[in-house]
């Protein structure tokens, strides 16, 4: 009988090869956010496992009083994996005494905007032309994105965390 329980665990060094392949298949080797080049396979992260298989992955970077979600991927959307990973990273942020979570998405990613706003994130900043600038570092970033919307801008969302 299969164990359908979703387990969330920190990324371990033994997970890195599989995570590297997973990230590369979805994002390429690098992700560029607000002009910063991240290598998600090398970042801190949380892995969601169901039935012994990778169900999702969240990678993040901690800087000062902020924990930035760099990537969030669920193998099967709308199955609760993304929500579970965001809840787990919020718990990790509180444990680290971090005051806020932030995430950046692109103007075409309406699904991400909906997802994060439904999980207590608020719009914080719009960076017009930021993706156009990122293409100088990563030319393979698509020009046209979801829903046939031209990808041009970054939108940052923030969730304040109650500490204590």
Q: What are the language-model segments listed below?
A:
Residues 5-7:
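Extreme N-terminal starter segment of soluble prokaryotic enzymes
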Residues 33-35, 140-148:
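Short, P/G- and charge-enriched loop/turn segments at secondary-structure junctions
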Residues 74, 103-112, 124, 128-135:
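Conserved beta-strand-loop-alpha-helix junction that forms the acyl-donor binding cleft
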Residues 93-107:
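Conserved GNAT acetyl-CoA-binding A-motif
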